[in-house]
Curated annotation (Swiss-Prot):
A Pfam family this chain is assigned to: Methyltrn_RNA_2
Family, per entry: Belongs to the methyltransferase superfamily. TrmY family.
GO cellular component, one term: cytoplasm
Subcellular location: Cytoplasm
Keyword S-adenosyl-L-methionine: yes
Protein name in the entry: Putative pseudouridine methyltransferase
Enzyme class name: transferase
EC number(s) reported in the record: 2.1.1.-
């Protein structure tokens, strides 16, 4: 199982603001692009992949939208507007939820009112966490453990205070090269590396 977490610090947690954020300062299109490249391949979708989108621009609780490739049925296509609409439906389903609650949105998609920190604590129990960092070990040379989970961010970098807590959870730093890439591009390179390894 391959897992990915996209920490979208600028992404709003209301569907209206999310949709308005496409192509604007919040850059919510990053969510759709990352979903597309995480879940889909030509004429099909990947098996055994989970992506967690953590939307943090909120007045109450972060929203973690989880998509499981083995369980999705008909998401309606893989173009940007369709995928953003799926995220918007999850946000609509989360209205009125209290802290750390879970709701199923549709087959393969759930929404939780849980923070990035809490999510990665849970994932660390049965996943090896990897954070992308230009100073990390080059992915071609890195040993990738079982149940890898790759941590990504939107255009706002990971807060420095998060590094220490991630280190305590055993997170390893890996690099995809000297250039800063979009999260959706990182996903493609990670999948390609693991595909080559037949992981």
């Amino acid at each position: 199982m391959r897992s990915f977490v996209l920490r979208a610090r600028a992404a709003p947690t209301t569907s209206k603001a999310l949709l308005e954020g496409v192509g604007n300062e919040a850059h919510t299109e990053i969510l759709a692009h990352t979903m597309m490249n995480t879940m889909f391949v030509a004429q099909s979708h990947r098996e055994d992949v989970v992506v967690h989108l953590v939307l943090e621009s909120t007045k109450d609780y972060s929203r973690t939208i989880t998509i499981r490739s083995n369980d999705i049925t008909n998401i309606g296509g893989f173009h940007e507007s369709t995928l953003i609409a799926a995220v918007a439906r999850a946000l609509d389903a989360s209205v009125g939820m209290g802290k750390e609650q879970l709701r199923e949105v549709e087959p393969g998609i759930t929404v939780r009112t849980v923070s990035f920190e809490r999510l990665v604590q849970e994932l660390a129990e049965d996943h090896q966490l990897y954070m992308l960092d230009k100073k990390g070990e080059f992915v071609r040379d890195a040993e990738i453990g079982e149940n890898p989970c790759f941590l990504l961010t939107d255009h706002i970098p990971m807060p420095k205070k998060s590094f220490n807590s991630l280190k305590r959870l055993g997170t390893e730093k890996i690099s995809l090269g000297p250039k800063m890439l979009f999260a959706s591009q990182c996903v493609v390179l990670i999948h390609n590396e693991l595909d080559i390894r037949e992981f």
